Amino acid sequence: MKLHEYEAKELFAKYGVKIPPGRLALTPEEVRKAAEEMGPPVVLKAQVVVAGRGKAGGIKVAKRVEEAYELSKQMFGMNIKGLTVRKLYVTKYLEVEREMYLSLIIDRATRRFLFLASPVGGMDIEEIAKTTPEKIKRVYVDPFVGLRDYHVRSIVSWLGFSPGTAQWQQAASIVQAMYKIAVDYDAELVESNPLALTKEGDVVPLDARVIVDDNALFRHPELEKALEEDPRDITEFEAYAKKIGFHYVELDGDIGIIGNGAGLTMATMDLVYHFGGRPANFLDIGGGASREVVREAVKVLLNHPRAKVIFINIFGGITRADEVAYGVKEALQAAGGTTKKIVVRMKGTNEELGRAILAEIGVPLFESAEEAAKKAVELAKL
């Protein structure tokens, strides 16, 4: 479960970390009220649980109350990496002396917690990691030993603070709080980027991210409730798929994928990659899917803005090929046709009947998955 920034900052505050003043807003009017209460300048931050929202236009600075109001009208409803902005977090703008990076993850190879710290941070941290990896310090913490003072000293000194200063103590408190959050909330990631030294001399997390292990949510009923009320990182297609009853994951390519069974669907994606294409999604209709489920699955990809081609790969055991074919036919009829190309490979139960149905509507059928995948990639490049 990915927490929104405002939720992550509430956790930081719960563990004694000083955070910048902020208000959650659901409407432009609430943004205006928050800006009036805090006084400009303020920062408007889109609450979507993806990295890189700043570069995508999801963070804006407003120097006047009315500017905050007008900017918020532009930001509400915008799409950032497939997610619609429905909440804005309005925070007080702080003058920053220096930006740093600090995160805590789980290193599964060593079965230990791993702190990553850098005296430089911000939107370009990925580039920094690539070009100057020596600026990032790695500090491992054995969970059976716990976080010790020597761990904290190593991290805080690397961030550039001197022992005995107020900044040292603030940074140390943040390190300790992040570790406690990770342990108490079964977190897979606790991050502040940027962690900032303000011109007033305070060390504060300007941004905060927390990802909680989904398998541990039963231990955190308050988070389960929050997830039910706000699905957060589920796209509109994923939400619709969940409602219908098939498994769907959004990806960034242009070839729509439909398969029956997770293994076959993933193998289909691998074939697309093998021939130089990129899947737009993972969509598993499951075993024994009816024509209604197939119809809705095809409709999802017909409406997908990036999917140029729809590649359907079916092995019919308990899934009947004629039901799949009827589902494709009904989806196309409901849409009034499509300019998207559809490629089908279908083997198994009632295969001949399914072939005949697809032939009626002019959908090509391929003998092998490799041949079909290659054709799908070729069509996507046209």
Curated annotation (Swiss-Prot):
* Cofactor(s) of this protein: Mg(2+)
What domain of life does the UniProt record list for this protein's source?
A: Archaea
Which BP terms from GO are recorded? succinyl-CoA metabolic process; tricarboxylic acid cycle
Q: In which pathway does it act?
A: Carbohydrate metabolism; tricarboxylic acid cycle; succinate from succinyl-CoA (ligase route): step 1/1
Summarize the protein's role: Succinyl-CoA synthetase functions in the citric acid cycle (TCA), coupling the hydrolysis of succinyl-CoA to the synthesis of either ATP or GTP and thus represents the only step of substrate-level phosphorylation in the TCA. The beta subunit provides nucleotide specificity of the enzyme and binds the substrate succinate, while the binding sites for coenzyme A and phosphate are found in the alpha subunit.
A GO CC term assigned to this protein in UniProt: succinate-CoA ligase complex
Q: What class of enzyme is it?
A: ligase
Chain positions recorded as Mg(2+) binding sites:
N193, D207
Residue sites binding substrate per the record: N260, G317, I318, T319
NCBIfam families xrefs: PRK00696.1, sucCoAbeta
Q: What is this protein called?
A: Succinate--CoA ligase [ADP-forming] subunit beta
* Residues reported to bind ATP: K45, G52, R53, G54, L94, E99
Which InterPro entries does the UniProt record give?
A: ATP-grasp (IPR011761), ATP-grasp_succ-CoA_synth-type (IPR013650), ATP_grasp_subdomain_1 (IPR013815), Succ-CoA_synthase_bsu_CS (IPR017866), SUCC_ACL_C (IPR005811), Succ_CoA_ligase-like_bsu (IPR005809), Succinyl-CoA_synth-like (IPR016102)
What is the catalytic activity of this protein? succinate + ATP + CoA = succinyl-CoA + ADP + phosphate; GTP + succinate + CoA = succinyl-CoA + GDP + phosphate
Give one GO molecular function term. Answer: succinate-CoA ligase (ADP-forming) activity
Q: Which family does it belong to?
A: Belongs to the succinate/malate CoA ligase beta subunit family.
Q: Which residues form the ATP-grasp domain?
A: 9-240
**What Enzyme Commission number does this protein have?**
6.2.1.5
Q: How does it assemble?
A: Heterotetramer of two alpha and two beta subunits.
Q: What keywords tag this UniProt record? A: ATP-binding, Ligase, Magnesium, Metal-binding, Nucleotide-binding, Tricarboxylic acid cycle
The entry's free-text remark on the cofactor is: Binds 1 Mg(2+) ion per subunit.
